[in-house]
Swiss-Prot record:
Region (G3), start-end ranges: 91-94
Annotated compartments: Cytoplasm
Protein known as: Elongation factor 1-alpha
Entry keyword annotation includes GTP-binding: yes
């Protein structure tokens, strides 16, 4: 056995009919963990329903009911392998929920794959000014996804035309406007359906000499989409940062006690550590840490862990609280925070006093837009107008926000997963935000359990 491969997360974005699901499905089919029998079953069912051409997209369908409707909605986490990586695909079909999932979702994508359909009319629709594609790409960029791969799909429908591949020039301008550097992007012509340039070089596009991208890490070259995924720069996982673990749930387990559960976002959690929960302001000792019912030496970023804490009742802490190391930049309640907010789809105008619900990590809390400080250019961040009266769809602004209940958030620059949020209103995501700074407070006097203030470990004077 060689060394374990690194994990990378990719998000697949693009216009609704660009072929996202088919392309993603094809990769999972060929490199993923789906067995032959399931695939054959899919093919048979698809043929019976007269949807033979959907068979790859079907790999992404878990729910029978969705199959009959002929569209994919389910956000599915799917995995496949490249020579270098284990890849998790965060499929992104349904637009509204996709946005929320991308922000509060379990994982920050390391790279976005933008799928553009080459068909005449399709391409133009995909990158038009108000297209979903622009929204998705902007969102990925705003949320800190800095690596991008562009796949020009459906080349089979253009008779594999080299001339049509020239749309990469327009696509290149398009991604540049969003904020990406086209030099650092692999542009690959593919057919997600036929499989050309997906895993193997296409025989239909002899004119394509391969892609090249240039980043700080150097120049890389390749022919296929798989090569491009393999050339993603490995993400640095934030183990060296202080611990931040947003709680998903808190359980009471007979004979063991209180067990909070959540995903380690930064740092590590170990037995014996003294931790603080914010904004509850509870401090105690971690007795043990486990994952998938096995004891763990240490929980690392990305691990979903359960841990047992001493003398804390399930009433003291709850979902949305954040656990951190008491001795190392412990988390605190946010009295207010300043965020860069992009309004995506709000039917009216947003002014001071607007109070929607924010979804940030596992917290779900109403926050007031206290003061609109500046309207800014969403690409450069430059100020366009000071103290605007209101903002509307398409605008970006700096806003001072005040939570209606105790809440723990962090600046995006310090702890990314705790520094991005979705603004929900009218059952949809109306805006997204990235936190610039936080005014912290110690909140109410907290509970410190006896376990947290042990003077000396017993072993040291039991000699």
């Amino acid at each position: 056995m060689g060394k374990e491969k690194n994990h990378v997360n990719v998000v697949v974005i693009g216009h609704v009919d660009s072929g996202k699901s088919t392309t993603t499905g094809h990769l999972i089919y060929k490199c993923g963990g789906i067995d032959k029998r399931t695939i054959e079953k899919f093919e048979k069912e698809a043929a019976e329903l007269g949807k033979g051409s959907f068979k790859y997209a079907w790999v992404l369908d878990k729910l029978k009911a969705e199959r009959e409707r002929g569209i994919t909605i389910d956000i599915a986490l799917w995995k496949f392998e490249t020579p270098k990586y284990y890849v998790t695909v965060i499929d992104a079909p349904g637009h509204r929920d996709f946005i929320k999932n991308m922000i509060t979702g379990t994982s920050q994508a390391d790279c976005a794959i933008l799928i553009i359909a080459a068909g005449t009319g399709e391409f133009e629709a995909g990158i038009s000014k108000d297209g979903q594609t622009r929204e998705h790409a902007l969102l990925a960029f705003t949320l800190g996804v800095r690596q991008l791969i562009v796949a020009i799909n459906k080349m089979d429908t253009t008779k594999w035309s080299e001339q049509r591949f020239e749309i990469v020039k327009e696509t290149s301008n398009f991604v540049k406007k969003v904020g990406y550097n086209p030099k650092s992007i692999a542009f690959v012509p593919i057919s997600g359906w036929h499989g050309d340039n997906m895993l193997e070089e296409s025989t239909n596009m002899g004119w394509f000499k391969g892609w090249t991208k240039e980043t700080k890490a150097g120049v890389s070259k390749g022919k296929t989409l798989l090569d491009a995924i393999d050339a993603i720069e490995p993400p640095s996982r934030p183990t060296d940062k202080p611990l931040r673990l947003p709680l998903q749930d808190v359980y009471k387990i007979g004979g063991i006690g209180t067990v909070p559960v959540g995903r380690v976002e930064t740092g590590t959690i170990k037995a014996g550590m003294v931790v603080t929960f914010a904004p509850a302001n509870v401090t105690t000792e971690v007795k043990s840490v486990e994952m998938h019912h096995e004891q763990l030496e240490a929980g690392m970023p990305g691990d979903n862990v359960g841990f047992n804490v001493k003398n804390v009742s399930v009433k003291d802490i709850r979902r949305g609280n954040v656990c951190g190391d008491t001795k190392c930049d412990p988390p605190k309640e946010a009295a207010s925070f300043v965020a860069q907010v992009i309004v995506l789809n709000h039917p009216g105008q947003i002014g001071n006093g607007y109070c929607p619900v924010l979804d940030c990590h596992t917290a779900h809390i109403a926050c007031k837009f206290d003061t609109l400080q500046q309207k800014i250019d969403r690409r450069t961040g430059k100020a366009l107008e000071e103290a605007p009266k209101f903002v509307k769809s398409g605008d970006a602004c700096l806003v001072k926000m005040v939570p209606s209940k105790a809440m723990c958030v962090e600046p995006f620059a310090d702890y990314p997963p705790l520094g991005r949020f979705a603004v929900r209103d009218m059952r949809q995501t109306v805006a997204v935000g990235v936190i610039k700074s936080v005014e912290k407070t110690d909140g109410k006097a907290g509970k410190v359990t006896k376990a947290a203030v042990k003077p000396v470990p017993r072993s040291s004077y039991a000699r």
